[in-house]
């Protein structure tokens, strides 16, 4: 008997526990191939950006743009923070991660969906409280959803405070990354 695939939302509604939400990372392949030289140029330009610029957009969307080193450090701390929040029983948060890849299996962007659990039933709410879209080629993120304030207050702000204490290291990492990217793009142009 052949199993019919179910959508993630169907699995969430049928699931009695949140265990499946955090057990793996789903991969979705997009029908295009990322232009690697353009992506490398964007990354090199991202080294020259301000540490971070963030603002609210229309329809309760939160946008943040980073320089390259800050983005990579932010991503690392973001996953650590979300992991610790989801394992803390008092926060009642769970999450899913979708890696969106191109046809060469390069991760173009990641989508993290954060779900609140219903306190009485301990089941996930049917809709994500908020989604975090991490755009790797532009070193930026876009967050939207009804729980955007939770993201800003409990996730984004503490990570930002932590990163502000590492600005000297970020400058060094950024300079090293820019040099490596410059060498890489000049090597590619000579081929």
Where is each model-derived feature located?
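Eukaryotic regulatory low-complexity N-terminal regions enriched in Ser/Thr, Pro, acidic
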Residues: 136-187
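Short Lys/Arg-enriched alpha/beta "domain-start" segment
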Residues: 22-130, 153-158
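Gly/Ser-centered flexible loop/linker motifs
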Residues: 132-134
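Polybasic, low-complexity terminal segments and linkers that are predominantly intrinsically disordered
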Residues: 1-30, 141, 174-191
């Amino acid at each position: 008997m052949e199993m019919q695939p179910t959508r993630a939302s169907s699995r969430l509604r049928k699931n009695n526990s949140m265990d499946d939400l955090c057990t793996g990372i789903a991969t979705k392949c997009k029908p295009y191939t990322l232009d690697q030289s353009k992506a490398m140029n964007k990354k090199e330009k991202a080294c020259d950006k301000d540490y971070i610029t963030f603002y609210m957009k229309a329809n309760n969307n939160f946008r943040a743009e980073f320089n390259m080193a800050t983005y990579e450090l932010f991503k690392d701390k973001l996953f650590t923070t979300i992991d610790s929040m989801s394992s803390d029983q008092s926060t009642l948060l769970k999450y899913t991660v979708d890696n969106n890849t191109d046809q060469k299996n390069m991760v173009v962007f990641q989508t993290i969906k954060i779900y609140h659990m219903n306190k009485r039933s301990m089941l996930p709410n049917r809709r994500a409280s908020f989604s975090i879209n991490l755009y790797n080629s532009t070193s930026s993120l876009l967050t939207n959803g009804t729980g955007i304030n939770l993201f800003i207050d409990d996730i984004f702000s503490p990570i930002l405070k932590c990163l502000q204490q590492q600005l000297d290291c970020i400058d060094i990492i950024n300079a090293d990354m820019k040099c490596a990217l410059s060498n890489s793009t000049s090597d590619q142009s000579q081929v």
